[in-house]
Amino acid sequence: MSIIAITVFVAGYALIASDRVSKTRVALTCAAIMVGAGIVGSDDVFYSHEAGIDWDVIFLLLGMMIIVSVLRHTGVFEYVAIWAVKRANAAPLRIMILLVLVTALGSALLDNVTTVLLIAPVTLLVCDRLGVNSTPFLVAEVFASNVGGAATLVGDPPNIIIASRAGLTFNDFLIHMAPAVLVVMIALIGLLPWLLGSVTAEPDRVADVLSLNEREAIHDRGLLIKCGVVLVLVFAAFIAHPVLHIQPSLVALLGAGVLVRFSGLERSDYLSSVEWDTLLFFAGLFVMVGALVKTGVVEQLARAATELTGGNELLTVGLILGISAPVSGIIDNIPYVATMTPIVTELVAAMPGHVHPDTFWWALALSADFGGNLTAVAASANVVMLGIARRSGTPISFWKFTRKGAVVTAVSLVLSAVYLWLRYFVFG
């Protein structure tokens, strides 16, 4: 069974990477083969957290997509777009820095998928107003979302899994992860000129945008107030997740339901903007990866790698960093972390105890979160952003993303390794 699972997964991944076939079709077809071959049971598809569809992710995306769709009808995205351009004096690099910082902060406080859903429409409007290619901006924002989301417990789904299995708190993540994220963010800002390239705004459009009054962009203040109230409540519930223990997916769906009820919009007004292709792609991808988990392929690889360390703590941390980032970049960091957590638990118990046991959890979190920047399908935020780009008429190819992502991931891992070594082995 494991040979069939590996063959189907590799073939499907190659087709997704080729950009020649709809990735949604590929994912659903591969998922159907996995189920048809008996690798993943029909019950597992719908009810298994490790081998089936992660409904928390699906419903979180659906709820936030509906909220963002309703929010579009207020004109607030046009307002923010004009404000950002004027604030940066229409300079593309300054605009990119501003949007990247907003994305990173939003991802840390909320979660990276929600932030991407909110920032992408603003970015597309800014680029459209200035007549510049939106691809560098969207790619940079995805990188920032994965980096910024690593800072807190609620910022990235893998962090939530790690916190649950290791008994870590919101404050633990803030104290131990945020410093590393700050260092990597500084490096990412330094890479922005390279990511931007030779993009320049059209002079005529710059003059037109600078002359606009952003307040005139708001054309439904009543709906904006309703959206604002719902978003504040939704975001507050996200932040209070460790206390309330209410799943973010449920919060997002409740928020979407309230907005739909009181917005006065027609059903087609908010459902037409939902990224149905993206949701179906995720469903298929979860089953594809679940087949590798179900057959024990991922666990066997992880165990074989960790046995090589022989109890050396520094080598173990380095191995976790070196293995987790590329593997997370290939099979999606959420199911990978779900599989690795019991293995790290065993590792912690087997170590001699010269460094704090949580060091291994921070290594897993940093490598899995930053590994999410490696490929176009490595993290939920990546898939969502590329789906939005495709629908806007500016598709981003798998390899265009990966060429940039490989560099950003490599820099992030080197800085993470130095951070872990200095903090926990030299000064710890």
UniProtKB/Swiss-Prot annotation:
Keyword match Cell division: no
Keyword annotations from UniProtKB, A to Z: Cell membrane, Membrane, Transmembrane, Transmembrane helix, Transport
Record localization: Cell membrane
Membrane-spanning ranges: 26-46, 51-71, 90-110, 135-155, 177-197, 223-243, 278-298, 314-334, 359-379, 407-427
One Pfam family in the UniProt entry: CitMHS
Gene Ontology cellular component terms for the protein in this record: plasma membrane
GO molecular function list: arsenite transmembrane transporter activity
Family: Belongs to the CitM (TC 2.A.11) transporter family.
Name of the protein in question: Uncharacterized transporter MT2759
Species name: Mycobacterium tuberculosis (strain CDC 1551 / Oshkosh)
